[in-house]
C-alpha cells in the first residue's frame, strides 16, 4: 500500500468485477498508469452471480437488437482471446406446445438481422444432439451460445493488467472521492481488514462498480437512476445438459439452462429490489419453486436432480421506464461522462451491459479516458 500512496495515477478504476478488470487491462495496455481497487475480492458482485452464459445475443434479438448485435460480436472476440475460459457448447432455443410457434420465425429473422447464426432444426434432431431436452418440444433453433467461467475470465484480465503494469488492490473500499474545484482528483480508501484510511490521487476515476456505482457518484452529489434487478439462480448437483437450452419466447423467468463443468445452472428471475437490500439478498421459496417448475419444462430430468445451492445477484441496469421486473430495460452499454452530464470533471461511469460485453465496455470507457487525458492510443484488446 505504501508504494501506491507515493504514486500519481492516470486512472483509478473502482470495481473488481469483469468490467473493472477488463478496463484495467485495456488502460494498462495503452500505457496508462493504472490502479484498480476492489472493496472485497474479485468477482464478488454480479460477475460471480450469473449463469456463466456466453451469450450469442439470440436471447435479445427480438426485444433488444442493439444488445444482441453487441453480444455476437463480443462472443466471437472472446472465443479467440479467452478460449481457455470457454466451453463451446452451442445452444438450443426450443418451442414447447404452450408456446407460440410463430414466434420462432420472428426470432430467426431478428437473429439474422443482428448477425447471429440461427438455424431451425427438427425436434428429432434437437433430441438427438441434446438428449436431456424436453421430448415434447415442437420446434428448435440452434445458435452459438456457450458456457464461460466468469471467475477465470476476471482473473485472466487482472493478471494481464498487472503484467502490463497496473497496480491492483483488494479489500480497499472507496469511502470518498477527492474533490477540488469541481473536479475528481482521486479516491479515499478504507482497508476493510484494518480500518486504515488513505487518499490516492489520479487524473481520471472510472466508476465500474456495477450496481454499487450509484453509491460512488453520490459521494460527489451526483445521481444515476439505476434499477437494481435481482436475479436468482439454482445450481444442480450434476450436469444434465451438454448444450445451453433456452425457451424460444420473449425473455422470462427460468428460461435458460446452462451446462457448467460438472453441474448445470437454471435461471433466472428478475425482480426490482430496494437499494438497502443489495448487500444482503434473500432468496425466497417462491423463487426456488418457479425455477424448478420452469426448469423442468426445459429438461424434465431436473425434477429428480439434487439442488446444490441457490444464489442471487443484482443487475446494474439503468432505469428507463416503469417496468417492475426490468425485463424491458436495454442490456446495452451506458458510459457517462460526468463532466458533460453533471459538470464534474475527472469522473466516468461505465455501467449497464453484461458480462458478455465487458471487453467492449472497457474499450468505450478507456477511449473516453484517453480522450480526456489527450493520449492517443488505440485499443489492443
Predicted stretch roles:
Residues 7-9, 194-204:
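Core beta-strand elements of the Rossmann-like FAD/NAD(P) dinucleotide-binding domain
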Residues 11-35:
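N-terminal Rossmann-like FAD-binding beta1-loop-alpha1 element of flavoenzymes
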Residues 207-221:
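Flavin (primarily FAD) binding-site architecture
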Residues 51-125, 129, 254-255:
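Dinucleotide-binding Rossmann-like beta1-alpha1 core, especially the glycine-rich loop
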